[in-house]
Amino acid sequence: MFFRISTVFVVALAAFAAASPAPWGAPPPTTTTHPPVTTTVTVTAPATTTTIPASQCNTGDAQCCNSVQSATAPAVTSLLGLLGIVLEDINVLVGLSCDPISVIGVGGGANCVQQPVCCENNNFNGLINIGCTPINIFL
């Protein structure tokens, strides 16, 4: 008699354990996925990178960037990947952490301690500017 009760108890306990998928008090797991967002940017690079006067910056605003690197640099490719930006031409310069500078106030109003560049209107809130060309703000 004791053997039958023990067997029924063990079978019932195993069935109960198999029927409860989540730990006590934990909500069932939910998985939400969002489709990836990809931004494609077309930038044409100059044949050679030359320094141009700030007054000739006609492809966009003059920017003062903390860093200007090739699009193939590891830090730049990581950032482009995180932002979902795909470049069609990887032979371009990319400005990182850029702020607009005033070309009108050459001298005092155009202070840029880092790298002054002219970019092709492909900026992402100053975090990254694509298609940059170095400029000389003192010409």
Curated annotation (Swiss-Prot):
<dbReference type="InterPro" id="IPR001338">
    <property type="entry name" value="Hydrophobin"/>
</dbReference>
<feature type="signal peptide">
    <location>
        <begin position="1"/>
        <end position="21"/>
    </location>
</feature>
<comment type="similarity">
    <text>Belongs to the fungal hydrophobin family.</text>
</comment>
<keyword id="KW-0964">Secreted</keyword>
<feature type="disulfide bond">
    <location>
        <begin position="64"/>
        <end position="112"/>
    </location>
</feature>
<feature type="disulfide bond">
    <location>
        <begin position="65"/>
        <end position="98"/>
    </location>
</feature>
<comment type="subunit">
    <text>Self-assembles to form functional amyloid fibrils called rodlets. Self-assembly into fibrillar rodlets occurs spontaneously at hydrophobic:hydrophilic interfaces and the rodlets further associate laterally to form amphipathic monolayers.</text>
</comment>
<dbReference type="GO" id="GO:0005576">
    <property type="term" value="C:extracellular region"/>
</dbReference>
<comment type="function">
    <text>Aerial growth, conidiation, and dispersal of filamentous fungi in the environment rely upon a capability of their secreting small amphipathic proteins called hydrophobins (HPBs) with low sequence identity. Class I can self-assemble into an outermost layer of rodlet bundles on aerial cell surfaces, conferring cellular hydrophobicity that supports fungal growth, development and dispersal; whereas Class II form highly ordered films at water-air interfaces through intermolecular interactions but contribute nothing to the rodlet structure.</text>
</comment>
<dbReference type="GO" id="GO:0005199">
    <property type="term" value="F:structural constituent of cell wall"/>
</dbReference>
<dbReference type="GO" id="GO:0009277">
    <property type="term" value="C:fungal-type cell wall"/>
</dbReference>
<protein>
    <recommendedName>
        <fullName>Class I hydrophobin 1</fullName>
    </recommendedName>
</protein>
<keyword id="KW-1015">Disulfide bond</keyword>
<feature type="disulfide bond">
    <location>
        <begin position="119"/>
        <end position="132"/>
    </location>
</feature>
<keyword id="KW-0732">Signal</keyword>
<dbReference type="Pfam" id="PF01185">
    <property type="entry name" value="Hydrophobin"/>
</dbReference>
<feature type="disulfide bond">
    <location>
        <begin position="57"/>
        <end position="118"/>
    </location>
</feature>
<keyword id="KW-0134">Cell wall</keyword>
